[in-house]
């Protein structure tokens, strides 16, 4: 009898003589998409579905209430909103360089790709900033380059003992997600939907609001011929929000410190979620997108990240 009591005591917490609660095993593994906790992904998915539902009925009303073409916050987000992607892609490029091995020709090609990625990001950032214009250019460029350098230094410190193959695996996962979302959004979704942006609707006579579920705009080319910019019909879905959501992949850095401290990995993940949410809000304020646009852009990248993490880390990263 005493042995039975000892067994039950080890397996459960006795709260009262009539109530007992199972004690979770310290070795129990949480359900994962690679390095992403499924319950975290599910929580974000629920919020995005709610936002899409609200946007389905009140997209135009929300944008009308928030629209401010002169908003400094909106302009800053337009210039720097893709910073999470740039940080992540830059770190991925550096990881590819660090993964090079003298005995592997393939790793050397990947290292060259890593160099090209960072050179391309510098040019992309400068050109993008000049296109936006305004007094924020200098501040935004300095902020971007300072954060990229700091992020790469921190990533190096955390992964200095990580195996080269692990560095390459994470970096290639990031690049795969970026390429996939770029093709889906820029080659398929945006041209196919041709949804007019709020800021274009406001200044273009007889150009009406188009719900997100309506695919294609038969009057698009007539308006473009009349002088409306082609970019004005790329509202659905939000590329800035999608790029900001790529920052969630920083939580998957294959560092031993992260594997030993899942809570730290979660802090990075949820911090990136909050940053992406601020970017999404800024895109609505400046009239570049509607609530449904940013919701779908975020959802696309989240789905791609879960899929890529599941493939890259099939056994999960606890």
Regions found by a protein language model. Name each.
Residues 31-36, 41-45, 101, 108, ...:
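Membrane-embedded catalytic cores of phosphoryl/pyrophosphoryl-handling enzymes
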Residues 120-141, 172-197, 262-285:
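Hydrophobic alpha-helical transmembrane segments of integral membrane proteins
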Residues 135-164, 171-172:
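Membrane-embedded alpha-helical bundles of polytopic integral membrane proteins
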């Amino acid at each position: 009898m005493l042995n039975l009591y000892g067994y039950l005591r080890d397996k459960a917490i006795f709260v009262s003589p009539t109530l007992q609660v199972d004690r979770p095993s310290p070795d129990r593994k949480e359900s994962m998409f690679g390095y992403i906790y499924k319950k975290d992904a599910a929580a974000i998915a629920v919020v995005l579905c709610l936002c899409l539902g609200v946007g389905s009925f009140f997209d135009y009303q929300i944008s009308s209430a928030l629209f401010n073409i002169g908003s400094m916050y909106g302009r800053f987000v337009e210039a720097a909103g893709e910073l999470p992607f740039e940080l992540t892609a830059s770190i991925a490029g550096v990881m590819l360089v660090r993964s090079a091995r003298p005995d592997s020709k393939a790793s050397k090609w990947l290292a060259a790709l890593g160099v090209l990625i960072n050179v391309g990001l510098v040019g992309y950032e400068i050109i993008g900033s000049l296109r936006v214009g305004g007094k924020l250019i200098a501040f935004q460029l300095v902020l971007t380059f300072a954060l990229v350098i700091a992020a790469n230094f921190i990533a190096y410190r955390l992964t200095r003992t990580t195996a080269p193959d692990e560095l390459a695996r994470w970096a290639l996962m990031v690049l795969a997600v970026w390429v996939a979302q770029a093709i889906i959004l820029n080659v398929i979704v945006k041209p196919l939907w041709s949804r007019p942006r709020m800021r274009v609707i406001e200044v273009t006579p007889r150009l009406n609001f188009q719900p997100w579920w309506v695919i294609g705009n038969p009057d698009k080319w007539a308006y473009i011929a009349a002088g409306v910019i082609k970019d004005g019909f790329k509202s659905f879905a939000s590329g800035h929000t999608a790029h900001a959501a790529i920052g969630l992949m920083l939580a998957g850095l294959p560092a031993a410190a992260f594997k030993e401290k899942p809570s730290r990995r979660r802090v990075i993940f949820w911090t990136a979620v909050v940053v992406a949410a601020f970017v999404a809000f800024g895109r609505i304020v400046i009239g570049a997108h509607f609530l449904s646009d940013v919701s779908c852009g975020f959802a696309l990248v989240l789905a791609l990240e879960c899929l890529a993490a599941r493939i890259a880390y099939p056994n999960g990263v606890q």
